[in-house]
């Protein structure tokens, strides 16, 4: 599913391009990012191009590259597993560079995505899954208004270590 560009005060959400693949291949191979995001294997530029051209252009998802207002790539976000009959979807966001975190980019991106999910796509529920050891992400989503609704105990395994997988959600009426 393709979508127009969305502009905020600090971020631009735009269609993903093959040129973005180098940024993602670089960051998505960092062990900390792989752990926090649940990536089970490294990626490279060619794999990311395939994701951009195939997997990120399906009828049940909409993906964006996040850029700052000057157009520099800082991450990606998407609504995936959109199920209009049930009015629910999952949300994902990755801003991998620590220098770009805690600057309001993630908060604005999530708000733009939730506005789109609830208002444009008429979703009633938006879910997100978080690696339990990623406590910064858990606090971030709580601050936005997501509520924890379940725990998949030891549902995530990375590099010889188990972690719980935390299921969170926000409803239209809470937004």
Regions found by a protein language model. Give the residues of each.
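A short, well-structured alpha-helix characteristic of acyl/acetyltransferase catalytic modules
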Residues: 1-50, 174
């Amino acid at each position: 599913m393709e979508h127009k560009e969305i502009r905020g005060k600090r971020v631009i959400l735009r269609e993903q391009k093959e040129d973005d693949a180098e940024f993602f291949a670089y960051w998505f191979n960092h062990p900390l990012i792989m752990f926090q995001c649940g990536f089970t294997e490294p990626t490279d530029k060619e794999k990311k191009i395939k994701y951009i051209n195939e997997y990120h252009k399906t009828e049940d998802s909409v993906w964006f590259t996040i850029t700052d207002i000057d157009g520099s790539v800082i991450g990606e976000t998407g609504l995936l597993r959109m199920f209009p009959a049930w009015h629910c979807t999952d949300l994902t966001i990755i801003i991998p560079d620590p220098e770009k975190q805690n600057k309001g980019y993630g908060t604005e991106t999530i708000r733009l995505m939730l506005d789109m999910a609830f208002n444009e796509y008429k979703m009633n529920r938006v879910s997100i899954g978080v690696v339990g050891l990623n406590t910064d992400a858990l606090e971030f989503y709580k601050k936005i208004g997501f509520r924890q609704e379940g725990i998949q105990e030891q549902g995530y395994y990375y590099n010889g270590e188990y972690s719980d997988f935390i299921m969170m959600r926000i409803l239209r009426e809470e937004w």
